[in-house]
Structure formats: structure tokens, C-alpha cells
């Protein structure tokens, strides 16, 4: 009860907001999946993934106010790592006490070597995470170490906790021979932890884990973090922040990364370039996905209503990202989003496919900001040529006369536009061959080469459009690849690539 004297003196105790709804949903999920056997292709459904995601985020959000004399001088997030703070966390206490402590009672009966069902798996991993204890019952960080200045000690303890959460999930996957069960390891367990070290220590040190067919999503999660550091400095294209925990990315961010770390597309996102990003937020009624697009650098915020658990998606696809083409497959549509059908999940970067875009929808379209070529047929402009230097050089001869390049006409029929494209390409090819021998115009040659490549991209875009509108595409739709010279993508082809 609140003390009336304290209220009179204006002293109001801090009250933690506990999202009981996520606890109720978690309890229902555990009951629903408690007897569901884990088989080779069993996965956690989208609805259940989002329930788990909410539980971990709500636990983080409910951390108690930290004592001034009980903070880490190293900046470690002790509010989620030590029993001193976790036992004060109102969400954690409510979770343990919920439904006459039924969840905690079930958790106490489990150990990592006897779990065979989905509900057991989820309850065990989630309770290990929010309890701040390793599988052997030891705390992530002892209370006496909260104010420790021993950087090596604290970093080693957090790294061990992060690694054993992932190792435990792989151990269960290997024993059951399962491919797709996956929860991950939350962002705060990666404090000063090198993803590459964790990846190699787990996979290089365990012969049984060498079969990448087992625990595919876990492998994909750790492999991604092994090649992409948490803080990329000048190379970062995106930064996510939740409760002060930041993470930067230079690649497309698949759903299993945001889900596994505990981030959401509804968090604070900062863009460091003007290249477009597609932020996938939910499923639609065409077996596809809805996304919002952002083009300008700075803080971006998804303002759409947060979808229900069975529809919500967390994934970001980078467009026009030419910084690391070898990792472009992370942005392939069927790699960046986890399919809700277990058997259709794609977790192999090398074998990922990029089909199905015609089922997706951009949902933040504005009348003055439409990139589709139905509404904006104006082609990419050709730069004006620079003036030729006025002085003659050795072996100078008169500049050859170039053929006139016909202007595109957007109102023509598709067949006429294709013939016109071919005519323009032939004209440009003739001009390129003529001017290529003219030593003064190497810059003009470069511009012609660039424009020919751009026209090739538009030809692919046009072919895709014809196939999609006629619904006649018995083979995979052609992909618009990044420009061979500068890696750019015409605005009309953004939704078809990366």
C-alpha cells in the first residue's frame, strides 16, 4: 500500500508497467505446444515467434531503476545480467507467479538433455534467458561483480552466457536432428562479444555441429553475426536502438537476425545513406508481404499500426547497396523473411531465391512519391557531354559525326518500346565504336558505356512488367541486377532486386 505521508510530501513510488497480455499469450502458447513433438522440419510459427519476441522485449523494458552505486563502470547492462536487478524486475516476478507459478513449476522439471517437445524447448530457453542463469544454474554475472573494473572477467562471463544459450539450442537440434527450431540470443548478451569468435568457437570446437543441415537457422544467425560486427563506424548503413542497446548493419537484415537479437522494425532506426530500404512489417492477403520504403538518410520511423502476432514481420532489405556485393543474397526476398511454412524456410545464403515480388505491396505510397514506371515514365537522364579541350594533340584528327539518338516515347505500345530500345542500343553502340578511337573523348565513352548498361537494366524491367501484366511467366522472372559500373538501380526497378 502507498504510504499516505509519502503521497502528501509528493513522493510517488516508481511503478513498473507490466504487459500481462504478453505473459498470458506466452502461457497459452506453452500449453498449446507442450505435447507437440519436435521433428526434423518442425519450426516455431510466426505467431509464436512474435510472442517470444514480445516476452523478451517486455522483460527488458521492465528493468528496475538502477542504484547509483550498483552500476557497471565498464558500461555492461547489469540490469539484465545479475540477480540483484532481475529479482526486482516486475515483469519477471509476474511471469514466475502467473497462474499459480505453473510456468516456473514446469521449467524446474526440464533439463537440456530430455527436451523433445516444442513447448518444453521454448519454455526452457526463454526462462534461461530472462532468469539470467546459465544451464548449470550459475548467474551470468555474480552480484559481487556488478561494480568490477576487471574487463576481461566481465567480458568472459557475458561471452560464456551468450555462447551457452546458442550452444544449448544447437545441442537440442543435434540430438533431435532438427533444422529450424531457433530463438537466438538477445542483444544485451552481445556486450563486447565478437560474433566471429562465438561462431568459430562453437562450430570449430564441436565435430557434431559440422553438419549444417542441423540447426540451419541457428547457423545462419551465427554466420551473419560472424561477418558483420556490431559497431561498423564508417561502414554502417543502418542503426537500430532499443532501450539504449544499439546495433549497426551494412547488409540487408533478415528476419532471423532482428528476431534473434530482439530488435523490431518499430524501434528507432537511423539511416546513414540516401539509398532506399524496404522495411517489411506484415503479411498480406495475397500470400505476400507488405513493406514501407524509406529513401532519405536520418531517423526513420514506421508509423503504421503494429500488426497482430500472426502477421507481424521484422526484416529490412537494402536497395542500391554496392558496398559488399558478395553478401547480396542476404537481401533475397525468401532469405530475408522466414516463411511461416516450416518446409519452405530458406536458411542457406548460397541457395536462396528471390521470387514472389509480385505478391508484395508497398503501403506508404504518396501521390508525389511514386517510383513505379506506370506513374513516372521519365527515363534516367543522360548527362550533357563535357566540352572537348580546344587544343589539338599529337595525331589529332577530326571528331567523327555521331548518329542522332532517338528520344524514348512512353506512350507507345510495349512492342514499339522494345523496338525503340533496340534501335537506341544499336545507335549508341555505333556511336561508341566511332568515338572510341577519338582520344579526346574518353570521358564521353565512359558516359556512353554507363548509359548502355542503364538501358540494359530498363530492358529487364520492361520484360518483367510485360510478363507480370500478362501473367505469362512459366520461368523465373528476370532479375534486375546492380549497374555493372556503379552498382546503382533505376528507381523503377527497386522492388525487383537485392
Curated annotation (Swiss-Prot):
It is found in: Virion membrane. InterPro entries: Poxvirus_A26L. Residues 378-390 have a biased composition (Pro residues). Residues 355-367 have a biased composition (Basic and acidic residues). Residues 352-391 are annotated as: Disordered. It holds the Pfam family Pox_A30L_A26L. Disulfide bonds join 43-342. Keywords: Disulfide bond, Membrane, Phosphoprotein, Virion. One of its GO terms (cellular component) is membrane. Belongs to the orthopoxvirus OPG153 protein family. Envelop protein that mediates acid-dependent endocytosis into host cells. Plays an important role in endocytic entry of the virus by acting as an acid-sensitive membrane fusion suppressor. Low pH in host endosomes triggers conformational changes to allow de-repression of viral fusion complex activity and membrane fusion within vesicles. Also plays a role in bridging the mature virion with structural protein OPG152. Interacts with proteins OPG094 and OPG143. Interacts with OPG154. Interacts with OPG152. Interacts with host laminin. This is Envelop protein OPG153.
Amino acid at each position: 500500500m502507498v504510504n499516505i505521508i509519502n503521497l502528501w510530501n509528493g513522493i510517488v513510488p516508481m511503478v513498473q508497467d507490466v504487459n500481462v497480455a504478453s505473459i498470458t499469450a506466452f502461457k497459452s502458447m506453452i500449453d498449446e505446444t507442450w505435447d507437440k513433438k519436435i521433428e526434423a522440419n518442425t519450426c516455431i510459427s510466426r505467431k509464436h515467434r512474435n510472442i517470444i519476441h514480445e516476452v523478451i522485449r517486455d522483460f527488458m523494458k521492465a528493468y528496475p531503476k538502477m542504484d547509483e552505486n550498483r552500476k557497471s563502470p565498464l558500461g555492461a547492462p547489469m540490469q539484465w545480467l545479475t540477480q540483484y536487478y532481475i529479482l526486482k524486475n516486475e515483469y519477471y516476478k509476474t511471469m514466475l507467479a502467473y497462474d499459480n507459478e505453473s510456468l516456473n513449476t514446469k521449467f524446474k522439471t526440464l533439463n537440456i538433455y530430455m527436451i523433445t517437445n516444442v513447448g518444453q524447448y521454448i519454455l526452457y530457453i526463454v526462462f534461461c534467458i530472462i532468469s539470467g542463469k546459465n544451464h548449470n544454474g550459475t548467474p551470468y554475472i555474480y552480484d559481487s561483480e556488478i561494480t568490477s573494473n576487471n574487463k576481461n572477467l566481465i567480458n568472459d562471463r557475458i561471452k560464456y552466457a551468450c555462447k551457452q544459450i546458442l550452444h544449448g539450442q544447437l545441442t537440442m537440434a543435434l540430438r533431435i536432428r532438427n533444422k529450424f527450431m531457433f530463438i537466438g540470443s538477445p542483444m544485451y548478451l552481445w556486450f563486447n562479444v565478437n560474433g566471429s569468435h562465438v561462431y568459430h568457437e562453437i562450430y570449430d570446437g564441436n565435430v557434431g555441429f559440422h553438419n549444417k543441415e542441423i540447426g540451419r537457422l541457428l547457423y545462419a544467425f551465427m554466420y551473419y553475426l560472424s561477418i558483420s560486427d556490431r559497431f561498423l563506424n564508417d561502414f554502417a548503413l543502418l542503426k537500430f536502438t532499443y532501450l539504449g542497446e544499439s546495433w549497426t548493419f551494412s547488409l540487408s537484415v533478415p528476419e532471423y537476425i532482428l528476431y534473434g537479437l530482439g530488435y523490431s522494425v518499430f524501434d528507432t532506426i537511423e539511416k546513414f545513406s540516401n539509398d532506399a530500404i524496404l522495411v517489411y512489417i506484415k503479411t498480406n492477403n495475397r500470400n505476400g508481404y507488405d513493406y514501407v520504403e524509406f529513401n532519405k538518410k536520418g531517423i526513420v520511423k514506421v508509423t503504421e499500426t503494429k500488426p497482430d502476432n500472426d502477421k507481424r514481420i521484422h526484416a529490412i532489405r537494402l536497395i542500391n547497396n554496392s558496398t559488399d556485393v558478395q553478401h547480396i543474397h542476404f537481401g533475397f526476398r525468401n532469405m530475408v523473411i522466414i516463411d511461416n511454412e516450416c518446409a519452405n524456410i530458406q536458411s542457406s545464403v548460397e541457395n536462396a531465391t528471390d521470387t514472389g515480388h509480385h505478391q508484395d505491396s508497398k503501403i506508404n505510397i504518396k501521390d508525389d512519391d511514386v517510383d513505379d514506371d506506370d506513374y513516372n515514365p521519365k527515363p534516367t537522364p543522360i548527362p550533357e557531354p563535357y566540352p572537348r579541350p580546344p587544343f589539338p594533340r599529337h595525331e589529332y584528327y577530326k571528331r567523327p559525326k555521331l548518329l542522332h539518338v532517338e528520344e524514348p516515347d512512353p506512350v507507345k505500345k510495349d512492342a514499339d518500346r522494345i523496338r525503340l530500345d533496340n534501335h537506341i542500343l544499336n545507335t549508341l553502340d555505333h556511336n561508341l565504336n566511332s568515338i572510341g578511337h577519338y582520344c579526346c573523348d574518353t570521358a564521353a565513352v565512359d558516359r556512353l558505356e554507363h548509359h548502355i548498361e542503364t538501358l540494359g537494366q530498363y530492358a529487364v524491367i520492361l520484360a518483367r512488367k510485360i510478363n507480370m501484366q500478362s501473367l505469362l511467366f512459366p520461368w523465373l522472372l528476370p532479375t534486375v541486377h546492380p549497374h555493372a559500373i556503379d552498382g546503382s538501380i533505376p528507381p523503377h526497378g527497386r522492388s525487383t532486386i537485392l
